[in-house]
From Swiss-Prot:
Subunit and interaction comment: Homodimer.
Protein name, UniProt field: 3-dehydroquinate dehydratase
Gene3D superfamilies: Aldolase class I
Coiled-coil segments: none
This protein's record includes keyword Isomerase: no
Organism for this UniProt entry: Streptococcus pneumoniae (strain P1031)
Pfam families: DHquinase_I (PF01487)
Length: 225
């Protein structure tokens, strides 16, 4: 289980002021570029990629329809992703498949996609169909984050993930039940078949996130013989 921490600068000055040494315990850095105005993203990108040079990095534009901070037309979304991908070659590129399905074909040349689905309202009843459709597309990683309201919501997603991972052992997954009741899903990734778990440093990027320090301790305990 790799631990992912998001950086969410709201300006070039904030990006330049990031202390990269505080993120040494994170296995992967996620740059949530949606906290910037869309016209500032390409201006801030050099500072982010220089700051975290040599680290695994996920480039994410989380749009408002999936719980993020930015609204983008399909043309704007694809343009920004392609520009960052071609200029900086991030290790992973998050792509909101269900929000931008109509332009997905333009991303087929990119082998490092994280095909993602986020639902901040509920754990939908068609989770198996969602996981199946994303798996068939054979991305670098399938990511699903949904809001849990009951313990059963959490257990259902865990069972679906374990089942899909068993049937598709070469495919990487990260599935998250958001909210307080879903916190357990963040610490059982290895059991359910998730490759990543998201943790927070100063500011959470999703409901129910656990601090990086706590997640590191939990991982150490789980790794004990």
């Amino acid at each position: 289980m790799k631990l992912i921490v998001s950086v969410m600068p709201r300006s070039l000055e904030e990006a330049q002021a990031l202390d990269d040494t505080r993120y040494l315990d994170a296995d992967i850095i996620e740059w949530r570029a949606d906290y910037l105005p869309k016209e500032a993203i390409l201006q801030v990108a050099p500072a982010i990629f220089e700051k975290f040079a040599g680290r695994e990095l996920v480039f994410t534009l989380r749009t408002r329809s999936e719980g993020g901070e930015i609204d983008l037309s399909p043309e704007e979304y694809i343009h920004l992703i392609k520009e960052v991908a071609q200029l900086y070659q991030p290790d992973y590129i998050d792509f909101e498949y269900y929000s931008y399905k109509d332009v997905f074909e333009e991303m087929l040349d990119f082998p490092n996609l994280v095909l993602s689905y986020h639902n901040f309202q509920e754990t939908p009843e068609n989770m198996m169909e969602i996981l199946s459709e994303l798996t068939i597309l054979n991305p670098k990683l399938v990511k699903v984050a949904v809001m849990a309201h009951t313990e059963q919501d959490v257990l259902d997603l865990m069972n679906y993930t374990r089942g899909f991972k068993t049937l598709n052992p070469e495919q990487e997954y990260v599935t998250i039940s958001m909210g307080k009741v879903g916190k357990v899903s963040r610490i059982t990734a290895d059991v359910t078949g998730s490759s990543w778990s998201f943790a927070s440093l100063d500011e959470v990027s999703a409901p129910g996130q656990i601090s990086l320090a706590s997640m590191k301790k939990i991982r150490e305990i789980l790794d004990e013989a």
